[in-house]
Swiss-Prot record:
The gene is ATP6V0A2. GO terms for biological process: cellular response to increased oxygen levels; Golgi lumen acidification; immune response; intracellular iron ion homeostasis; proton transmembrane transport; regulation of macroautophagy; vacuolar acidification. It comes from Homo sapiens (Human). Its main location: membrane. This is V-type proton ATPase 116 kDa subunit a 2. It is linked to Cutis laxa, autosomal recessive, 2A: A disorder characterized by an excessive congenital skin wrinkling, a large fontanelle with delayed closure, a typical facial appearance with downslanting palpebral fissures, a general connective tissue weakness, and varying degrees of growth and developmental delay and neurological abnormalities. Some affected individuals develop seizures and mental deterioration later in life, whereas the skin phenotype tends to become milder with age. At the molecular level, an abnormal glycosylation of serum proteins is observed in many cases. Wrinkly skin syndrome: A rare autosomal recessive disorder characterized by wrinkling of the skin of the dorsum of the hands and feet, an increased number of palmar and plantar creases, wrinkled abdominal skin, multiple musculoskeletal abnormalities, microcephaly, growth failure and developmental delay. It is found in: Cell membrane; Endosome membrane.
Amino acid sequence: MGSLFRSETMCLAQLFLQSGTAYECLSALGEKGLVQFRDLNQNVSSFQRKFVGEVKRCEELERILVYLVQEINRADIPLPEGEASPPAPPLKQVLEMQEQLQKLEVELREVTKNKEKLRKNLLELIEYTHMLRVTKTFVKRNVEFEPTYEEFPSLESDSLLDYSCMQRLGAKLGFVSGLINQGKVEAFEKMLWRVCKGYTIVSYAELDESLEDPETGEVIKWYVFLISFWGEQIGHKVKKICDCYHCHVYPYPNTAEERREIQEGLNTRIQDLYTVLHKTEDYLRQVLCKAAESVYSRVIQVKKMKAIYHMLNMCSFDVTNKCLIAEVWCPEADLQDLRRALEEGSRESGATIPSFMNIIPTKETPPTRIRTNKFTEGFQNIVDAYGVGSYREVNPALFTIITFPFLFAVMFGDFGHGFVMFLFALLLVLNENHPRLNQSQEIMRMFFNGRYILLLMGLFSVYTGLIYNDCFSKSVNLFGSGWNVSAMYSSSHPPAEHKKMVLWNDSVVRHNSILQLDPSIPGVFRGPYPLGIDPIWNLATNRLTFLNSFKMKMSVILGIIHMTFGVILGIFNHLHFRKKFNIYLVSIPELLFMLCIFGYLIFMIFYKWLVFSAETSRVAPSILIEFINMFLFPASKTSGLYTGQEYVQRVLLVVTALSVPVLFLGKPLFLLWLHNGRSCFGVNRSGYTLIRKDSEEEVSLLGSQDIEEGNHQVEDGCREMACEEFNFGEILMTQVIHSIEYCLGCISNTASYLRLWALSLAHAQLSDVLWAMLMRVGLRVDTTYGVLLLLPVIALFAVLTIFILLIMEGLSAFLHAIRLHWVEFQNKFYVGAGTKFVPFSFSLLSSKFNNDDSVA
């Protein structure tokens, strides 16, 4: 938790890598994930860097592996994924691996090409057999005539044509037969009629079964056609039209004997093709199964090798071109591991001269490194979505672990809904090692990544549901109500007390639709409910009024405490960066302004709750009126909450008024005095540099990175650094804007926390409406079929509860909780202007196959 409170101390290290050991050293660093490399070749194009050839080789290997994975998936062969990630391949094995993969690719492409060719031939032969079978039905004559006109028996019997004319026509008859897509038949026929001007006779028949297209592989419906024409020119036109409509044209036999011979030959060839195709597929599957055993490790190895060469391209060579120089950011705590990794890489390469490192001082801002685990990672991502924390500033994620699910639960307070959410998150946590959860759809994967957030959100919702005493909009009476209805009846009290109290009798109960419990009557109110809200309020008509008052005050209290805590965290930042003047001139005035107004409001709320009981609540003054009178100084005196209230409030207002000019002018005037009193403004006593930032505070402290076990000490700052330009007007304007924003933000941010009350009220009302419209109707059915009606009612109630109250309302409360943390809480102390530490780590490479048959 210590590292989660503040980012780790970083140092800039210079690595000296021998050319022969650089690959092995970076492989060892990638396995450990210790350092973030700086690009020392920013001015060099990516195509002109030293190891661009090796990167292209890795990309070529990736292309081959993607092809292999696609073929393996196409063959429905499972891809084994190992639990342990294989190391990067040694350099001496890279060429061998490349040759193996290229040879395997050539073999697979050749076998696949032959298989596709065989399959295409087989489909064409099957189409040919279907065409012969169907066109045989077009022939209506059993006696063979001349082959050029045997398909037109009607020509002989036509009274308009004599036999000699038929012979002249028959001498020029021709036939085109084949198959055409079902959707193109109508257009094909119209085109033939218009182009050939009626000099064709077309016969169609639909195939009973769908066939696979040899070209596209799509299974579609086909029509067999037979076109009879006369004239060579008409024949050329018919063939061109068939080509335009992508018809599959096959030779048409002239005689029945020729048809039989072709049919027998086709059957033989089809059987032979089936045999050859099966053997080819078996061989292809054997090759793919053998390739599938090692493709996972090959993919990971190639990706690691490519990542290593990308990092090597960020290094520079020394003057002798025998040593690579790299600059890396490394946490102080990992320096020893970094040295051991370099030694390990040098030892594996067998180099005589080991690689080594050196710590170099720098004035640059280091990246922010915050160590997380699977529990804290989700909360850290919420903070980083707003902005990565500046180097060494307080990290809000440590406190967000508790405050975020708690504020969510305040808006989502329902025992039943929270318990359902808790069970769902618990199921994800218990099955977090299941491989399918990481490969699920994006929405489910998002739930899985935030499983611990959901777990705490559900757990805290159970707690707030107990406080609100809400379980699916109904109250639970666990300890017995603190209110006694029977004590209101006149029969419960002596006759002498009847005139002093407003009691009930049978007539009052019959003639009044609304009855009021009086806590001043003895025995009516026996004390507060042990846990949460008394269940009797669920029956009261003024329940909403009571809950609104309670939740509104609770929202204000939580909001002011949350914001005050943010200001206090800012003090830790000032102490760490040794800017104590910010504590006295910024943080303390901010705290005084906040506490003297809104802190006093919390005091009045708690004072009224503690001093005035249920019996004396009638005479309790209004907090709203008292708070308004605090600023108006009315002439008419009120009773007030306590003695001396007026003097206390005036003192608080005076302190508030005095804190505002200090907040506006204190820091700029102090910096002006500091500037005039020193010849060099850039350095303070601890060697921290004061640099002004444009978007944040004009002055912030950045430590000189002399952190190699205290060996480097900061000498005279005025001799080391140039003096910074001091602009008093800009500093004053920045501080004035910040002060105005803070003073107005105290009011607007406090009002913003009222969303806790608003969303809690909305959630409770939606739950109540859903219960009233479904469950209440189903439970009131007292017929013999009531049980049958109750089952679909419960099912519908469960579905609407999940989709409306859990998902939609939960998402709304989640977004509002994020806003309260980002805006109202973090702007009190969190700058969020840093850069995230992105280590060179092989663990960041995905080890799962994606839907595109690759590993991302």
